[in-house]
Amino acid sequence: LLFNIYTLIGGMPEVVQLYAERRDILSLESTYETLLQGYRDDVEKYALGKQLPEVIRFILKEGWHKAGQIITLGGFAGSSYNAREVGEAFRLLEKAMLLELVYPTTATEVPATPEIKRMPKLVWLDTGLVNYAAQVQKEVLGAKDIMDAWRGMIAEQIVAQELLTLTDKV
């Protein structure tokens, strides 16, 4: 039960504290919105120029719907942006520790070297933010098995998120 709640609300300190006080998922909406707006407002800190901030804003709007999924950089989420622009935007968001692009490996021995020529899987920093921003909270809350929620993407997100905490990247 505790893991299911964690999977639903995430681990952002403000969200966890508010949930501990109120035990009400609906009361978390303004906190999630404040966090997301803060990320959107900080775009200029990450990117210079005209095009790059635009691509980052697009990712911060549409990218949540791609959590736990293998993505293509060119034309990401139905956009007209090319792979170079999207890749640069994702690299900046990775540096800001908002997300991680996880590349597959075919290695059978350690170290498992990522194959950066292949398509990555998108993992965001917090599953609670993903659930809120992708508007799948109700589906996740109602799921008997996390694998059934949102076509298994939340399971992909939470497992990848937890694995990333075992590295020095987070």
Predicted feature descriptions by range:
Residues T7, M12, V16-V170:
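Accessory nucleic acid-recognition modules appended to NTPase machines
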Residues L1:
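His/Asp/Glu-rich metal-coordinating catalytic cores
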